[in-house]
Amino acid sequence: MQTFLPTPDFLETAKILDNKRLNKQIVEAYQIFSGRVPTKNHPACLMWEGHEYDLSRYIATLCSEYYMRFGKSHAIREHLQDVKFYSFDSTKKPFWLGDGLFHFSQRVNLLRKDFDYYHTKKFFGGISKDSLDCYPKGYYWPVAKPNGTAHKDRMNWIEWSSENNF
């Protein structure tokens, strides 16, 4: 489970994602939003906790891009119409939105998934296919429970950023 954010801008992110990931992001983000996840302790769930308004905006933006690409609404778009957005705090932004290391790790991992597609996109310059092994494996999770894999991945990214003056 993952919500990709190679940039802090939801619209830029939606436009950057390849078709497969765009669809998958809508589904996975909605699963997090609706609480239909195998575990609520997953770092992808934890990072959005208290930020339901922004998560719903992320989903709506992805759904709009889906419509632009495919000329039809994503089925999840209908579910968002019933959401009472006023019940969410729209002033509390995720602390990790805009964190350079977080967004960079997202770009690295998207390149690992489909280098040929992503290496031509804005914000992905300067990372060659050969250099991908220089970066930590896993994701830089902004929120992770101690002693788990996600925490270890987070610490590996922090160590890498310190060693490389990122």
Language-model features, listed with the residues they occupy:
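Expand to "…catalyze enediolate/carbanion chemistry for C-C bond making/breaking, isomerization
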Residues: 1-166
